[in-house]
Swiss-Prot record:
Signal peptide: 1-19
Domain SRCR: 49-150, 179-293, 317-416, 426-535
Species for this entry: Xenopus laevis (African clawed frog)
Protein name (record): Lysyl oxidase homolog 2
Lineage of origin: Eukaryota, Metazoa, Chordata, Craniata, Vertebrata
Modified residues (2',4',5'-topaquinone): 680
Encoding gene, per UniProt annotation: loxl2
């Protein structure tokens, strides 16, 4: 029997008297350090911690603490790595990497809550560490402390950004909530959409009485389990079923308004007194039933029981840059152009409107500070205020002006999604860490479910990304075609899946195209079985389209000045027949500026030992294919292409306060840092397309970054830039340059037929 669960949670409730209401604060439980925790003080105030300030990554920032209804900072006096570890663990990271004094991440505002913090490293909260006391300090905000946490998350840790209440009185703990399917039609259904609402108290599951249960309560529970709304159910069937069973009821009731992101945010409806005659807590009622409506991506379909791939069909709102289904940076469509949302006043209620609009449940995290990467283009909405019942984010109140906002404040969300059980159909075996290993899948062969390996012949980054998504481990950092160094399960050595090819939208590896039962793997499994390595964050490369449009020009260059480029095959094949003394080549030249807007540095796939030295450029190239430069006819036929042999990756320039890390000279480390860009100027060798043989006409000019997807990115849709191009034999006009995915389909089609031009004259050098 299938049962929907949520992760362990603790609810602290206050019930002063029957008929009065109090809010339920929410305490996420997570795995603490391996050492046994010390004896906690009798009273440890409930706080929330966040990383704020001038930061570039989600796992670093100024430490801020929410206490007594107000956010405040922590002074750097006596702060240590022990304290940094506590802060990071409290936020769900396994450990701290470093801490920074003297307001490295900017000066905070308001109170300085803690000073002279002294931790031993085993506390569960910074509130348990010794200090001068709350608000007792002689510090200034120039001494605000910051931390950088490890990328690795604590397994199973769930974040709630609901602010805690301030309660006194009776302490009641609820350990878990579930929907338990009762009718046979729902017991084998995936996902579980209907059943009794039950809570776990002191290790035992108990039903919730329906005498004070409402559809608003059901809406909240459905949202917790990844469903956008509740629906009616057959009350007669459940009444008949309930009368035949003895039930153990929870002695409390809940009173939700319907817009809460979690049952823990609802109010306590009162204590249910037992009937004096029957001694039953719910003698006049029955167990509360919850029936949910799944979103499009999770609705049952004939033959499979679920959709094979998640395809975003919502025309007004989308999520970008997330590792998993139901998470990402929020983008909205306005006047045909996609733009982001500023995180001012961003909260779970507003985030839940987006999640439900996209067919998911309520929001489990409302993320601020571009935690899932920075977007591009306009910021369309700011200071959004929703009541939680809107059909679309555009129905909420918001400020159309975004003064003071920038893409460092892009809002993001993680939604509750239905439990499909996909994570139980694949595993990683033999790796040094839980995030890497040989891929083993559970497949039906000859009527029996068995574990086996995946043939690596067609294995690449996109397939590895699906595995990491399926396991909830983030993005793929590497896709391995040899795994002899990982000793997997000896009983799973046989190849059970081959010919795997994924598009990137699938929710599990089984949804990708593959050979099915007709496994064909000439190279065999064993050392050639597929493997992956997963990471929580990924880079995101975006080309500056405006710069390409502004710097494009034609140059007639003599062949004797192109000797090095000719040797590197940067010219069209007809250059082999061109006179080296009197001939020339017509070059379409331009500058390209490639930004890393993601959450991790972009690093070449190959190690330093495989880099190639280029005499002409006098440095090593780390990627053989980093970009494609193509000139296409209007029907997509390629008529000319750039032949830039390979690339050296470095930080040409960076945003303010970001240090360059990568440089090509002197065999330096190569890559592109988050917040930096690599500039290829129009006047360097091979930064062109040889159009000597191209006839006059209208064309598309296209640039694709990381075309073979050798390096994993959080978003590949923005790796393509396309321009309209008109060439009359002597002059060229480049116009309507834009990044893939930045406009609606309708607007994209208009661009392809728009005739606005920029005049770029012929240059002779």
């Amino acid at each position: 029997m299938l049962v929907s669960h949520v992760f362990l949670l603790t609810l602290s409730l206050s019930v002063p008297s029957l008929g009065q209401y109090e809010h339920w604060p929410y305490y996420p439980e997570y795995q603490g350090p391996p050492e046994p925790p010390p004896t906690q003080p009798k009273i440890v105030p409930q706080i929330h911690v966040r990383l704020a300030g001038e930061k570039r990554k989600h796992n670093e920032g100024r430490v801020e603490v929410y206490y007594e209804g107000e956010w405040g900072t922590v002074c750097d006096d006596d702060f240590s790595m022990y304290a940094a570890h506590i802060v990071c663990r409290e936020l769900g990271y396994q450990e701290a990497v470093s801490w920074s004094p003297s307001s490295k991440y900017g000066k905070g505002e308001g109170r300085i809550w803690l000073d002279n913090v002294n931790c031993n490293g085993r506390e569960r909260s910074i509130a348990s560490c010794s200090s001068n006391g709350w608000g007792v300090t002689d510090c200034k905000h120039s001494e605000d402390v910051g931390v950088q946490c490890s990328d690795r998350r604590i397994p199973g840790f769930k974040v709630s950004n609901e602010l805690p209440g301030h309660l006194e009185g009776l302490n009641i703990q609820v350990e878990d909530v579930r929907i338990r399917p009762i009718l046979s039609a729902y017991r084998k259904r995936v996902p579980v959409t209907e059943g009794f609402a039950e809570v776990k108290v002191q290790g035992s599951w108990r039903q919730v009485c329906n005498t004070q249960w409402s559809s608003k309560n059901s809406r909240v529970v459905c949202g917790m389990f990844g469903f956008p709304s509740e629906k009616k159910y057959n009350t007669k069937v459940y009444k008949m079923f309930s009368s035949r069973r003895k039930h153990t009821y929870w002695q409390f009731s809940a009173n939700c308004t319907g817009n809460e992101p979690h049952l823990s945010s609802c109010k306590v409806g009162g204590v249910l007194s037992p009937d004096p005659k029957t001694n039953q807590t719910c003698s006049d009622g029955a167990p509360a039933v919850v029936s949910c409506t799944p979103g499009r991506a999770f609705a049952p379909s004939p033959g499979t029981g679920f959709r094979k791939a998640f395809r975003q069909e919502q025309p007004l709102v989308r999520l970008r840059g997330g590792a998993n289904v139901g998470e990402g940076r929020v983008e909205v469509l306005k006047n045909g152009e996609w733009g982001t949302v500023c995180d001012d006043k961003w909260n779970l209620v507003t985030a839940s409107v987006i999640c439900r609009e996209l067919g998911f449940g309520s929001a489990k995290e409302a993320l601020v500070g571009a935690q899932l990467g920075q977007g591009m283009g306009q910021i369309h909405m700011s200071e959004i205020q929703c009541n939680g019942f809107e059909k679309s984010l555009t129905d909420c109140k918001f400020n159309i002006h975004s003064q003071g906002c920038n893409h460092e404040e892009d809002a993001a969300v993680r939604c509750n999604v239905p439990a499909m059980g996909f994570e139980n159909q694949v595993r990683l075996s033999g790796g040094r860490h839980p995030t890497e290993g040989r891929v083993e899948v559970l497949m039906e062969r000859n009527g029996t479910l068995r574990w086996g390996t995946v043939c690596s012949e067609t294995w690449g980054t996109m397939e590895a990304m699906i595995v990491c998504r399926q396991l909830g481990l983030g993005f793929a950092s590497h896709a391995f075609q040899e795994t002899w160094y990982w000793q997997g399960d000896i009983n799973a050595d046989d190849v059970v899946m081959s010919g795997v090819k994924c598009s990137g939208t699938e929710m599990s590896l089984a949804h990708c195209r593959h050979d099915g039962a007709n496994v064909n793997c000439p190279r065999g499994g064993g050392r050639f079985a597929a493997g992956v390595s997963c990471v929580e964050t990924a880079p995101d490369l975006v080309l500056n389209a405006a710069l390409v449009e502004q710097t494009t020009y034609l140059e007639d260059r003599p062949m004797f000045m192109l000797q090095c480029a000719h040797e590197e095959q940067c010219l069209a094949s007809s250059a082999d027949r061109t006179s080296p003394t009197t001939g020339y080549r017509r070059l379409l030249r331009f500058s390209s500026q490639i930004h890393n807007n993601g959450q991790a540095d972009f690093r070449p796939k190959t190690g330093r030992h495989a880099w190639i030295w280029h005499d002409c450029h006098r440095h090593y190239h780390s990627m053989e294919v980093f970009t494609h430069y193509d000139l296409l006819t209007l029907n997509g036929t390629k008529v000319a292409e750039g032949h830039k042999a390979s690339f050296c990756l470095e930080d040409s320039e960076c945003e303010a306060d970001i240090q360059k890390q990568y440089v090509c000279a002197n065999f330096g480390e190569q890559g592109i840092t988050v917040g930096c860009w690599d500039l290829y100027r129009h006047d360097i060798d091979c930064q062109w397309v040889d159009i000597t043989d191209v006839a006059p006409g209208d064309y598309f000019f296209q640039i694709i970054i990381n075309p073979n997807q050798e390096v994993a990115e959080s978003d590949y849709t923005n790796n393509i830039m396309k321009c309209r191009c008109r060439y009359d034999g002597q002059r060229i006009w480049m116009y309507n340059c834009h990044i893939g995915g930045s406009y609606s389909t309708e607007t994209e089609e208009k661009f392809e037929h728009f005739s606005g031009l920029l005049n770029n004259q012929l240059s002779t050098r």
